[in-house]
Design a protein with these regions (language model features):
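C-terminal capping/lid region of NAD(P)-dependent oxidoreductase domains
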Residues: 22, 140, 167-171, 191, ...
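Predominantly a Rossmann-like dinucleotide-binding segment in NAD(P)-dependent oxidoreductases
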Residues: 148-251, 379
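Hydrophobic residues in well-ordered beta-strands that form the structural core
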Residues: 78, 117, 142-144, 173, ...
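Conserved SAM-binding strand-loop segment of SAM-dependent methyltransferases
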Residues: 73-80
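Contiguous beta-strand/loop segments that form the cofactor/metal-binding neighborhood of enzyme cores
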Residues: 2-21, 210-307, 340-354, 370-371, ...
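Beta-strand-loop-alpha-helix segment that lines the small-molecule cofactor/substrate pocket
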Residues: 2, 84-86, 91, 97-98, ...
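N-terminal Rossmann-like dinucleotide-binding module
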Residues: 2-70
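Glycine- and charged-residue-rich phosphate/anionic-cofactor binding loop of Rossmann-like
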Residues: 50-53, 325-330, 347-365
Length: 389
């Protein structure tokens, strides 16, 4: 089969969605840090969205945020409770630091507000369960902020697996990382345990996990043998700290900068995963999905950006011959993935549809991360159990 035939077979039609602009959705933004910049930039493109309020714990920060983005007549509050108690909203973006994700999301759902929650879903599996229970009770739309889901190349991965071209998938290798990339340009909220709770595992590792788990239908995890470390983050001589003039960050570092896990999934699938904020390596390797009929190699990815390092390849047999079929990178994708993430959430709010990135899947992602941390602390393999919601 020719390369173009493979591409045409799997490429999804990219049709423009007609948006009903007759009713405007009133939205608020909780937390006005750097990720909120991405949210408001997409909201401003949508004619059916009215940004009416925002909240931030730091005095004056919300006001400066909206001024920077040229959004006027916006009411600003000091915390999520004040905002939700005083506004009639259709939806909120939760863009706060990890430790407050559960609290803000649950409060919004309990007060009848739809939520798009930035990843990670939360810090612990217990918090994830509480969020899912609140969502179920509220009947509102709660979608988790995984914009790579909307990248056409990431969609292609799922389509290839679902097509049966690979046969039964039995082994997956995935991960990613940065040679030097502990996220400190935004201050210390990403690296302090009191605010972040988890480091590289939840910040960028969740994207790698989602890419492959979504492709194979999010099977439940059974056990994990995990390992985490913080060698770079706690080193005051770490070059990024020194170059940016903040060697004191090392004393504040309280999360992981590397994590790895060997996970057994339902259906006889093994998942070999590793992620790093910092390492003495250019990449921990390609993503590989191995099956009984074929295997898929995805060049080293930056899943958090929804990007892959080059054309994918399927290794399979054709007419008794071993062949490699190259899948070109899809570059023409229309609007950016972040816009698609926000738009799909709001469309679900308008229609009463299902969340585009549902908690029923992301709780599995969260359970694996939780299991890796537990296993590393105990120094042995642990079972993963996800309670019924």
């Amino acid at each position: 089969m020719a390369d173009n035939d493979i591409l045409n077979k799997f490429k999804e039609d990219q049709e423009e969605t007609t948006i009903d602009t007759s009713k405007k959705l009133k939205v608020g933004i909780i937390g006005t840090g750097w990720i909120a910049d991405a949210h408001i930039q997409q909201f401003k493109k949508m004619p059916d969205v009215e940004i009416v309020c925002g909240a931030d714990l730091i005095d004056g920060k919300a006001e400066k945020f909206f001024e920077k983005h040229g959004v006027e007549n916006v009411r600003c509050y000091h915390n999520h409770k004040e905002l939700i108690d005083n506004e009639e909203l259709d939806a909120v973006s939760v863009c706060t630091y990890n430790r407050t994700h559960a609290e803000c999301t649950i409060y919004a759902l309990e007060h009848g507000v739809n939520v798009i929650l930035e990843k990670p879903m939360c810090v612990t599996i217990e918090e994830a369960v509480d969020i899912c229970k609140a969502e179920k009770k509220s009947g509102k739309v709660l979608s988790i902020g995984f914009q790579p889901r909307f990248d056409e190349n990431m969609k292609m991965v799922k389509k290839i697996v679902e097509s049966g071209q690979l046969g039964k998938v039995y082994y997956i290798q995935t991960g990613g990382g940065r040679r030097r990339g502990i996220p400190t340009p935004f201050g210390t909220t990403f690296i302090e345990n009191e605010t972040a709770g988890i480091g590289a595992l939840a910040d960028i590792g969740c994207y790698s996990l989602d890419m492959v788990l979504n492709a194979v239908g999010y099977p439940k995890p059974l056990t994990v043998s995990g390992y985490v470390s913080d060698y770079f983050g706690k080193d005051p001589n770490y070059c990024d700290y020194v170059q940016k003039g903040h060697p004191e960050y090392a004393s504040l570092f309280g999360v992981d900068d590397f994590g790895a896990g060997f996970i057994r999934l339902e259906g006889g699938i093994i998942l070999d995963f590793r992620i790093a904020w910092a390492m003495n390596l250019d990449t921990p390797g390609d993503t590989i999905i191995m099956g009984t009929k074929g295997s898929l190699r995805i060049p080293s990815t930056e899943c958090w950006n929804g990007s892959i390092g080059g054309p994918m390849k399927i290794y399979h047999e054709v007419a008794g011959e071993q062949v490699e079929t190259e899948i070109p990178v899809i570059t023409d994708q229309g609007e950016n993935n972040f816009y698609k993430k926000m738009r799909s959430f709001l469309d679900a709010v308008k229609t009463g549809g299902k969340a585009p990135v549902p908690t029923s899947q992301i709780i599995i992602n969260q359970a694996i991360i939780d299991g890796i941390v537990r296993s590393s602390k105990l120094g042995k393999e642990v079972e993963i159990s996800i309670p019924e919601i």
